[in-house]
């Protein structure tokens, strides 16, 4: 052969078309001569005398043409090569390609050597010399190719010899990179590179084989062996049906090897228990697919690895070629005896995947062309064809697995859908799950054991109704735990309370409650008991061996019926075993596989989900039924009696003025309970709501009495508080002229909301409900108590004879209920803070039209809050008493927090800090009340009394707060008669550790004080008042205590500080004259001095009383 080196260069001057053609012909002649002189055997053996064609990677011949030219050239080459192959069908052609492994940079300079054998045997035999092209020739050809690609294209199509085209085509194909690594491509290249078995003449189909072919495949007889081989590979290449593929493999192998019949076995089982299953058995050239599949499924043949000829091939991965079968000890003649067929020669070969693992075994029997054995050529053809068949079988198995997985997913989706469709019927749900499992896994029977569902349900109900933070003995589900003792396990026979059984396809599901005796004498129950105890999956291949191994009693009736069992626990969300699922006997008689266990696990999970969901649904239904019963009982007991209703309906209702309903200073202290109800009726009458909305008078009376009845007797948030809130709303509507901004329906809703806004109040706030995780906090996550109040309001309205909205139209009913709900929820101060800024923005913008839905909602919310805290604007005597009630209720909650939650309550709920209440009241007024009333009275000036009353009470609370800061404790009485707590003690009690702290705020002198030389420049606004703080660590005498209290309050009422100090001096002096303190006082420097006197038994001497008095006066 001739080396042809082509290098790339930039295009130079164009040359004539004739010169290009001459150069092309020269190159072609060189290629032809080289091919003619190279024998085929030397090419296959890679002889050293092979000619090479050297070219750089970036300067191949194809690079000199355009894309269109390359495409046309390839087509022409393929056509010419095909024609040449037909004309030279008796010769073999092998292509050896040695691609460069260097980097792209080195490839630009390093030559690539390609050995191109010729396909023309005549040329090979006539070669006699060798011609080498010079570098100058190569450069000239390269330049002409770059300048005249059209001339090269014309030469290729018109004048190129077939052998040159063939060699050029092979060279181009060898230079193409693979798109991706391909197992099929690697195997194909390996097969193509392997040496062929020399045959003296081409192998043709025998006459018997030709006549056995169906009409659609008669054309195969016209093909030689190579073409037939490739055609039969294409026949199985795209087949994904495993049955059709195996049938084609056996038929095609029979054609290639002239075998009479064949069988194909597929490998199954676990790594520790591998066996072969006959996919198709004894398939001939004329056997139809349907008949072959039916026969194989009717009698499944299973061969363990290492048993028989096929088993040995599967185990050793080595082919076995037997010339005389009956002389081989591994041959089993039972099939021949049954069928009357005589087996002579057997060729059995393994089928492996790309990893070398056995996926099947193919076996062919007897030759049909007169030969008595399978020769070496048959073995090679068989091996090569099975290489491709292995790829096809694995692809078909993967496809079959994907189809099965799709079916399984569809079944699981149906099961998931069934969980929600059958959630009200556990029996139907479990039956459907068992039916799907039986059909998918092909087993004879299914059963499901359930564990003590009643106890599980009771435990769940107890958890739902469990009181927060209360120690309660928990009942756990009677599930079987692995840590139970042997005696406990023996006593757990009665744990299975329900048994679901499903037999064959025509059998209905059976649901039973087995007794202890039934469970004790049932092998299936014992296995289920074992699984429930251990919580492990059990796959039993031989039940009898398992019973013997575990010393269990086997029921005689189950000895012959049960062979293999797959048993799996059913667990709930807490990983507790709530049941056991069983699959009994595969239809094929084989044990359950790991794949079966994996699928069955999904069924067990869905079964557990379904059981749990059904139980929850049933529990929810029962709880709702109980709730309905409880609501009926509550409705009956919460509704006012008929006698009370008739009595109230017959009472004479006084005018509004008699109850002082129009005034913002209304108080309920003087009203009896019946009067409170009459006052409510009068408010409805004065607003003309009874006649406007056609409210039956007896229904209104019953509703008012029922609302009063549903308030708990707490200290503040009780019925009388609701009455005061409703009266304030009435006064704002009438006296405050707010009714001009409201419709009659909204007035009705606001009054109802005021009366119901604290229904069933427990004396605790929302924060307490959340901290204790009460059922109310679980039911309502925000505005907990307010939502409960509204629900109670709805409950009373829905009670028989209490619906005061019964005459409203559906639209009006929805509107008034929306008003009631929004108004009640607005009493939550958290809602007030959310709405306040929006309301203030509207007021600051000068809003006067409040008829929009959002603006009306804001206005009603502000009015509800103003009414709810309106006690802060009552006269001081009323406000003081109400504040005492609020404080007592808060202190009760604080005590509960200490007791139940073991936490320190906030200051306003801490009984130990009750003296700080005046200060906290001032803060409450400044933060909530005054801003609200100020903006309301600025916009609606008719409600100014609320703002003024709040200001007055703030001054009173501030005054009392200052007294507390002076060291005096707040009152512990219901009235203001004795505003300062009396110091307890007796008149004759000795003086003990009295500590005085005096702060002088009214100083006219600018020099030093008696206690020190400190300069006191007092601000102007502090010179008109004095502050006196007395801290008591011991006890004073009774006389000085009473005089001191009166003096302090007289001084705070307006007497001059100097007079007060003189009185204080005289009282202290009188008391000191009566006592004889023995320890001198030690005044501190500055404007604050301290003096202590204590009684002592020491006789160290007496103290000058006049000196002591002068020091105290100087300090004051």
UniProtKB/Swiss-Prot annotation:
Binding of a divalent metal cation 1, residues: 721, 757-758, 868
EC main group: hydrolase
Cofactor note: Binds 2 divalent metal cations per subunit. Site 1 may preferentially bind zinc ions, while site 2 has a preference for magnesium and/or manganese ions.
Quaternary assembly: Interacts with PrBP.
Protein known as: cGMP-specific 3',5'-cyclic phosphodiesterase
Native species: Drosophila mojavensis (Fruit fly)
Signal peptide start-end: none
Gene: Pde6
Subcellular localization(s) per the UniProt record: Cell membrane
């Amino acid at each position: 052969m001739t080396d042809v080196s082509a290098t790339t260069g930039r295009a130079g001057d164009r040359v004539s078309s004739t010169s290009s053609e001459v150069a092309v012909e020269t190159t072609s002649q060189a290629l032809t001569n080289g091919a003619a002189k190279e024998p085929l055997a030397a090419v296959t053996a890679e002889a050293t005398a092979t000619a090479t064609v050297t070219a750089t990677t970036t300067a191949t011949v194809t690079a000199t043409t355009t894309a269109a030219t390359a495409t046309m050239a390839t087509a022409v080459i393929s056509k010419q090569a095909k024609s040449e192959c037909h004309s030279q069908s008796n010769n073999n052609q092998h292509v050896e390609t040695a691609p460069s492994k260097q980097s792209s940079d080195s490839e630009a300079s390093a030559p690539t050597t390609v050995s191109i054998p010729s396909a023309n045997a005549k040329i090979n035999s006539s070669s006699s010399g060798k011609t080498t092209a010079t570098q100058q020739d190569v450069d000239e050809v390269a330049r002409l190719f770059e300048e005249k690609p059209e001339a090269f294209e014309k030469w290729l199509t018109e004048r190129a010899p077939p052998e040159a085209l063939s060699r050029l085509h092979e060279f181009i194909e060898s230079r193409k990179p693979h798109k991706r690594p391909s197992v099929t491509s690697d195997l194909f290249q390996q097969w193509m590179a392997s040496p062929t078995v020399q045959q003296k003449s081409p192998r043709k189909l025998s006459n018997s084989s030709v006549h056995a072919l169906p009409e659609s495949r008669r054309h195969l007889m016209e093909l030689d062996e190579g073409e037939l081989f490739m055609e039969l590979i294409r026949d199985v290449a795209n087949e994904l049906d495993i049955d059709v593929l195996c049938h084609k493999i056996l038929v095609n192998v029979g054609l290639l090897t002239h075998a009479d019949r064949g069988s194909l076995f597929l490998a199954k089982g676990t790594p520790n228990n591998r066996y072969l299953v006959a996919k198709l058995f004894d398939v001939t050239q004329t056997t139809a697919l349907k008949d072959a599949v039916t026969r194989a499924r009717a009698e499944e043949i299973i061969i363990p690895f290492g048993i028989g000829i096929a088993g040995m091939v599967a185990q050793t991965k080595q082919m076995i070629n037997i010339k005389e079968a009956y002389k081989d000890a591994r041959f089993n003649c039972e099939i021949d005896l049954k069928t009357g067929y005589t087996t002579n020669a057997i060729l059995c070969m393994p089928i492996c995947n790309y990893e070398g693992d056995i996926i099947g075994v193919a076996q062919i029997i007897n030759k049909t062309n007169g030969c008595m054995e399978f020769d070496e050529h048959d073995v090679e053809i068989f091996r090569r064809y099975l290489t491709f068949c292995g790829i096809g079988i694995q692809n078909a198995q993967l496809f079959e697995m994907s189809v099965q997985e799709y079916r399984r997913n569809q079944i699981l989706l149906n099961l998931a859908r069934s969980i929600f469709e059958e959630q009200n019927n556990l029996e139907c749900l479990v039956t459907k799950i068992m039916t799907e499992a039986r059909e998918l896994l092909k087993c004879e029977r299914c059963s499901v054991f359930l564990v003590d569902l009643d106890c599980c349900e009771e435990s769940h109900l107890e958890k739902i109704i469990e009181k927060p933070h209360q120690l309660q003995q928990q009942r756990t589900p009677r599930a079987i735990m692995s840590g139970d003792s042997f005696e406990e396990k023996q006593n757990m026979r009665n744990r299975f309370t329900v048994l679901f059984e499903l037999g064959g396809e025509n059998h209905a599901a059976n649901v039973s409650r087995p007794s202890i005796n039934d469970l004790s004498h049932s092998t299936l129950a014992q296995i289920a008991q074992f699984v429930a105890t251990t919580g492990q999956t059990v796959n039993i291949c031989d039940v009898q061996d398992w019973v013997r191994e575990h010393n269990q009693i086997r029921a005689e009736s189950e000895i012959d019926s049960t062979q293999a069992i797959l048993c799996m626990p059913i667990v709930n969300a807490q990983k507790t075993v709530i049941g056991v699922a069983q699959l009994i006997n595969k239809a094929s008689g084989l044990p359950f596989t790991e794949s079966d266990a994996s699928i069955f696990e999904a069924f067990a999970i869905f079964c557990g989900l379904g059981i749990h969901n059904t139980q929850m649904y049933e529990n929810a239904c029962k709880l709702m039924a109980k709730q309905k019963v409880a609501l009926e009982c509550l409705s009956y007991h919460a509704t006012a009696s008929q006698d009370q209703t008739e009595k109230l309906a017959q009472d004479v209702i006084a005018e509004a003025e008699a109850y002082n309903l129009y005034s913002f200073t209304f108080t309920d202290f003087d009203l009896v309970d019946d009067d409170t109800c009459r006052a409510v009726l009068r408010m409805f009458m004065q607003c003309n709501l009874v006649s406007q909305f056609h409210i039956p008078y007896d229904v209104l009376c019953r509703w008012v009495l029922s609302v009063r009845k549903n308030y708990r007797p707490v200290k503040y948030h009780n019925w009388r508080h609701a009455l005061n809130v409703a009266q304030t709303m009435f006064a704002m509507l009438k006296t405050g002229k707010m009714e001009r901004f409201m419709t009659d329906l909204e007035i009705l809703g606001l009054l109802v909301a005021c009366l119901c806004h604290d229904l069933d109040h427990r004396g605790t706030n929302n924060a307490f409900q959340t901290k204790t995780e009460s059922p109310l906090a679980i039911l309502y996550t925000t505005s907990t108590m307010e939502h409960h109040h509204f629900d109670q309001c709805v409950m009373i309205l829905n009670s028989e004879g209490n619906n005061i909205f019964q005459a409203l139209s559906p639209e009006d009913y929805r509107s008034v209920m929306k008003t009631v709900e929004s108004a009640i929820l607005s009493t939550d101060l958290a809602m007030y803070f959310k709405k306040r800024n929006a309301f203030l923005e509207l007021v600051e913008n000068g809003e006067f039209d409040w008829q929009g839905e959002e603006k009306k909602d804001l206005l009603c919310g502000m009015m509800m809050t103003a009414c709810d805290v309106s006690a802060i604007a009552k006269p001081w005597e009323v406000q003081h008493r109400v504040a005492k009630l609020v404080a007592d209720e808060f202190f009760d909650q604080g005590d509960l927090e200490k007791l139940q939650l073991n936490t320190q309550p906030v200051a306003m709920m801490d009984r130990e800090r009750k003296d700080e209440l005046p200060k906290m009241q001032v803060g409450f007024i400044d933060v909530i009340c005054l801003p609200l009333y100020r903006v309301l009275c600025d916009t609606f000036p008719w409600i100014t009394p609320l703002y003024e009353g709040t200001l007055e009470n703030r001054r009173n609370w501030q005054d009392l707060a200052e007294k507390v800061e002076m060291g005096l404790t707040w009152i512990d009485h219901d009235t203001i008669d004795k505003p300062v707590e009396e110091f307890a003690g007796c008149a004759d009690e000795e003086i003990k550790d009295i500590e005085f702290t005096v702060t002088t705020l009214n100083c006219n002198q600018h020099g030093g004080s008696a206690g020190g030389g400190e300069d006191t420049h007092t601000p102007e606004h502090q010179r008109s008042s004095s502050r006196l703080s007395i801290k008591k660590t011991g006890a004073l005498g009774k006389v000085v205590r009473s005089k001191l209290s009166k003096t302090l309050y007289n001084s705070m009422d307006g007497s001059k500080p100097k007079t007060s100090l003189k009185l204080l001096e005289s009282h202290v002096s009188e008391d000191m004259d009566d006592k004889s303190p023995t320890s001198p006082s030690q005044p501190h420097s500055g404007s604050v001095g301290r003096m202590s006197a204590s009684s002592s038994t020491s006789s160290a001497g007496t103290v000058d009383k006049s000196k002591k008095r002068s020091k105290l006066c100087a300090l004051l």
